[in-house]
Swiss-Prot record:
This is G-protein coupled receptor family C group 5 member C. Keywords: Cell membrane, G-protein coupled receptor, Glycoprotein, Membrane, Phosphoprotein, Receptor, Signal, Transducer, Transmembrane, Transmembrane helix. The chain crosses the membrane at residues 51-71, 86-106, 121-141, 156-176, 210-230, 243-263, 281-301. Disulfide bonds: none annotated. Its main location: membrane. The modification Phosphotyrosine is found at Y415. Coiled coil: none annotated. Residues 24-50, 107-120, 177-209, 264-280 are extracellular. The gene is GPRC5C. The modification Phosphoserine is found at S345, S384, S404, S407.
């Protein structure tokens, strides 16, 4: 008997090991034999849809992460305060888009308790976050396009957060009701009338029920779509392009939702292909998330650092007073245009000062006019003085000697000009007015 038992054990041992060996042999091409069968869709080369969606979702995760960093890093460079108030909502939108790309992996992986629960809860919540941000942005655009000033940034973010929390409450209640159901069998067996609770698999749900749980998300999508149309009407046209971005995004989202709902509830069943339910959800997530990135996120990031026309106009009239070397040179150059030569403006009255250079009328012609004494010279001139009168010359329009390249009147030029005039003019009596060098005594 002992020998027979030993023989049976030796023959039965391979039978226990045979299912494991068969499972290892049935691993699809491209997957490791030690890999959990739950993740075969991620590496199965015979069904390439999982690998393609995995690559698309991975690229989306990287792109969304980079755009989030760019948007946050551009905060100090945003000149328009109205655009700065929308940055919080747009970052919240990017986080929702990043979650959609990550949820694609849960739809590619084969159904289990954790994957089905995450699909049912996060599918509606993540889309609700994105569409709530679009609704809040549309609400802000209604004020901006008509009054050129909108609500504060925390108000816009609070609106998006409250709208998305509604879907969180709906999905939480739905999961509690469907996953934990009361069954009176155990309570009746105990005889105390208490109800027992039996856990139900989250995957055991009809496709139509899954779609019906997303009615609130569809309502948010329709609100964003209709609000984008009304945001295109207003006096301030520079805000209309943001409404166009939202309109394109919601239009693409509506098209994606119509297609995947029809395929998920009707098309797959008609073609007897229930195995395409998971690819349908994964394709819908990846397509709509990329629509968010291409039609809304990238255009908004490109517009966030651009200044408003009002700021550009004010910058032309009142340039920013910086501390750079070029700014100092410009200011000195602008001020030097109106600085007088103090040697020739000592006798100017204070009321006659104007921000115009006294040499601005010089035309470069030969000195032909006679120099006239100023008021101060006539007041201090004694009647008996004749040949030794000191006359302070004034700079006039024709106060330059031929060949001089400088517009400033110099004493040497005055002396040379007066010397030529004294040689040509006839000498008169002592009382005659003689124009002499004001700096040299005879």
């Amino acid at each position: 008997m002992a020998i027979h038992r030993t023989v049976l054990m030796c023959l039965g041992l391979p039978l226990f090991l045979l299912p494991g060996a068969r499972a290892q042999e049935q691993a699809p091409p491209g997957c490791s034999p030690d890999l959990n069968p739950l993740y075969y869709n991620l590496c199965d080369r015979s069904e390439a849809w999982g690998i393609i969606l995995e690559a698309v979702a991975g690229a989306g995760v990287v792109t969304t992460f980079v755009l989030t960093i760019i948007l946050v890093a551009s905060l100090p460079f945003v000149q328009d305060t109205k655009k700065r108030s929308l940055l919080g909502t747009q970052v919240f939108f990017l986080l929702g888009t990043l979650g959609l790309f990550c949820l694609v992996f849960a739809c590619v992986v084969k159904p289990s308790f954790s994957t089905c629960a995450s699909r049912r809860f996060l599918f509606g919540v993540l889309f609700a976050i994105c569409f709530s941000c679009l609704v809040a942005h549309v609400l802000a655009l209604h004020f901006l396009v008509r009054k050129n000033h909108g609500p504060r940034g925390w108000v816009i973010f609070l609106v998006a957060l409250l709208l998305s929390l509604v879907e969180v409450i709906i999905n939480t209640e739905w999961l509690i009701i469907t996953l934990v159901r009361g069954a009176g069998t155990e309570g009746d067996a105990l005889g105390n009338g208490s109800a027992g609770w039996v856990a139900v698999s989250p995957c055991a749900i009809a496709n139509a029920d899954f779609v019906m749980a997303l009615i609130y998300v569809m309502l948010l999508l329709l609100c964003a779509f209709s609000g984008a149309w009304s945001a295109l009407c207003g006096r301030f046209k520079r805000w209309r392009k943001h409404g166009v971005f939202i309109l394109l995004t919601t239009t693409a989202s509506i098209a994606v939702w119509v297609v995947w709902i029809v395929m998920y509830t009707y098309g797959n069943r008609q073609h007897n292909s229930p195995t395409w339910d998971d690819p349908t959800l994964a394709i819908a997530l990846a397509t709509n998330a990329w629509a968010f990135v291409l039609f809304y996120v990238i255009p908004e990031v490109s517009q966030v650092t651009r200044s408003s026309p009002e700021q550009s106009y004010q910058g032309d009239l009142y340039p920013t007073r910086g501390v750079g070397y070029e700014t100092i040179l410009k200011e000195q150059k602008g001020q030097s245009m109106f600085v007088e030569n103090k040697a020739f403006s000592m006798d100017e009255p204070a009321s006659a000062k104007r921000p115009v250079s006294p040499y601005s009328g010089y035309n470069g012609q030969l000195l032909t006019s006679m120099y006239q004494p100023t008021e101060m010279t006539l007041m201090h001139k004694a009647p008996s003085d004749g040949a030794y009168d000191v006359i302070l010359p004034r700079a006039t329009a024709n106060s330059q000697v031929t060949g001089s390249a400088n517009s400033t009147l110099r004493a040497e030029d005055i002396y040379a000009a007066q010397g030529r005039q004294e040689a040509t003019l006839p000498k008169e009596g002592k009382n005659s007015q003689v124009f002499r060098n004001p700096y040299v005594w005879d």
